């Protein structure tokens, strides 16, 4: 299988997009402590990522609340259950790690939920930025806490929850 990639500019820095002919398999931050770059043997193909780039631009402009892109994250069954729960957090809202653990039917797995959240290969599209500490504090994020805060503020401004 050929791994394709492209970069997408965003207000929180450049994003690395990875996928194949059928689905997006990764969206990573290409700056910061956990920055990712293209792997050896990956093939650059900007044309294959036009749709997701357009949808990301709409998201950052406050015009899109859900993404319509085929996703294929690779992970364990537990990780994929956490990532599915993340996708169910409504735009503009947050949940705690405990909330997610309860949602997947394993309330004692708070730390494991945190680990799965940290290994989310599809940042923004699988909205791990919407997960916060039980006390309401911002916790780790691959793009850095400033980016997490920016994403939450963007969604808060455009969610209509406080209008």
Model-derived features with residue positions:
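Short Lys/Arg-enriched helix C-cap and helix-to-coil transition segments
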Residues: 124-131
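Major-groove recognition helix of helix-turn-helix-like DNA-binding domains
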Residues: 86, 111-119
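Gly/Ser/Thr-rich beta-alpha loop segments that engage phosphate groups in nucleotides
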Residues: 15, 77, 94, 107, ...
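Flexible interhelical turns and helix-capping residues at alpha-helix boundaries
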Residues: 90-93, 117, 121
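…primarily DNA-binding HTH/wHTH and HhH modules…
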Residues: 134-163
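Basic nucleic-acid-binding alpha-helical/helix-turn surface characteristic of O6-alkylguanine DNA
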Residues: 1-108, 154-163
């Amino acid at each position: 299988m050929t791994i394709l990639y492209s970069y997408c500019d965003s207000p929180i820095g450049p994003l690395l997009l990875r996928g194949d002919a059928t689905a997006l398999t990764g969206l990573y931050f290409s700056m910061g402590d956990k920055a990712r770059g293209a792997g050896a043997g990956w093939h650059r193909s900007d044309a294959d990522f036009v749709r997701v780039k357009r949808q990301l631009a709409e998201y950052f402009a406050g015009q899109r609340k859900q993404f319509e892109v085929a996703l294929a994250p690779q992970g364990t069954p537990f990780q994929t259950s956490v990532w599915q729960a993340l996708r169910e957090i409504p735009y503009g809202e947050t949940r705690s790690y405990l909330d997610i653990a309860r949602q997947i039917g394993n309330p004692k797995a708070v730390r494991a939920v945190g680990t799965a959240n940290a290994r989310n290969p599809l940042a923004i599209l699988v909205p791990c930025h919407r997960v916060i500490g039980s006390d309401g504090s911002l916790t780790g994020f691959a793009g850095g806490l400033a980016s997490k805060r920016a994403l939450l503020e963007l969604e808060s401004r455009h969610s209509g929850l406080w209008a």
